[in-house]
């Protein structure tokens, strides 16, 4: 049996000291579908959960202290961990991330359908998750640097060709010229609060 969900929010996980009392050889992971670790002090992506074969489909890591998720955080150097392919939903909002590694491509996460990296520090669009043919929704609202400046300016050209994507949340940034023809398939598009945006919506006017 697999538990529906476990919630470890509002703790001090990831702070100084040892969080796991046993050795990694004895650690068996978490037998749950949804794992919530929001509002902690996590600086390093919890690779241990996936290395031990935890059957996680949704992981919520919002409101932590991660600045990067380096390569081999979701997979070993060769091949993949046993159950990482089960992961469909990833919430990384309210961290300090500036980039994603190739761990987030379809070769590791073939069924990724929902991902949100809003309220981070991306200055360029992380295209790795767009490689997933199952991706339906992606959020990347409100990207700021340490001084609070809007730093995401470039539209992710080609995003309308993602076969399953129906929702893109890219508001509250500084997106400029959009040189791409929109399609009605992308029927939830949040571009609000991009003060310098230039976009042609003629192709989707009949659907608005």
Where are these regions (language model features)?
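Canonical leucine-rich repeat
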Residues: 16-17, 45, 69, 100, ...
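Leucine-rich repeat domain C-terminal region
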Residues: 77-85, 137-151, 166-167, 172, ...
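Leucine-rich repeat
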Residues: 1-2, 27-31, 51-55, 75-86, ...
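Conserved hydrophobic beta-strand positions in leucine-rich repeat
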Residues: 4-8, 33-37, 57-61, 88-92, ...
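LRR N-terminal entry segment and analogous cap-like coil->beta motifs
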Residues: 1-3, 11-14, 22, 32
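Extracellular beta-strand/beta-solenoid scaffold signature
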Residues: 17-24, 70-73
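Consensus "Asn ladder" position of solenoid repeat domains
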Residues: 11, 40, 64, 92-95, ...
